[in-house]
A protein has these predicted regions:
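Glycine-rich, aromatic-bearing surface loops/beta-hairpins
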Residues: 132-146, 151
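Conserved short "hinge" loops at termini or chain/domain junctions
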Residues: 1-85, 146-168
Length: 168
């Protein structure tokens, strides 16, 4: 079993930039990463290894997770892959997680709200911030598609292959 906390969340968090991840709690971060991972798995076309997963709920006690029932107060969803995925599959999933992270950033108007309203204080342009993040999302989406295209054209022995689906 590969727990998402280990194989997806840590590499994802290491590659993104954003102040929000410095001010939210560990539980909020894990819940957000869980939702991004589910979207990334759904977006991954034709993985050669099944990306089926199981969900469980846990609460944090000091530095460990304790599995609990879904209805328990403070329970955070976590996931693990039933099959062991390779680096290539994980790389594609992390790339899609980045796309959905920027998309989520853009969809929240609070991220672009002016903090100051005084006419004497110069602040950044909200339009420029939105434009910059839109371009970033397009770059991440192009990168994710390129990774997925390269992934689908090479088999496990690194030979050229088109159409090998779940046969390894």
């Amino acid at each position: 079993m590969q727990y998402w906390d280990d194989v997806l969340f840590q590499p994802f968090i290491a590659t993104i930039r954003g102040e929000i991840y410095g001010v939210i709690t560990q539980d909020e971060l894990e819940e957000e990463c869980f939702n991004l991972a589910r979207r990334a798995i759904a977006a991954f076309k034709f993985p050669k290894i099944s990306t089926d997963y199981e969900t469980f709920y846990a609460i944090r006690e000091e530095d460990t997770l304790v599995e609990v029932d879904e209805s328990t107060e403070g329970a955070i969803p976590h996931g693990y892959f039933i099959n062991d995925l390779g680096y290539k599959e994980l790389e594609v999933l992390i790339a899609w997680m980045k796309v959905y992270w920027v998309e989520q950033l853009l969809s929240n108007a609070d991220n672009f709200e002016d903090i100051y309203t005084d006419s004497n204080i110069k602040t950044y342009s909200r339009a420029n911030a939105v434009d910059k993040n839109t371009k970033l999302m397009d770059q991440y989406r192009t990168y994710a598609r390129d990774l997925e295209t390269r992934y689908s054209r090479v088999n496990a022995s690194r030979g050229a292959s088109i159409g090998d689906i779940n046969n390894e």
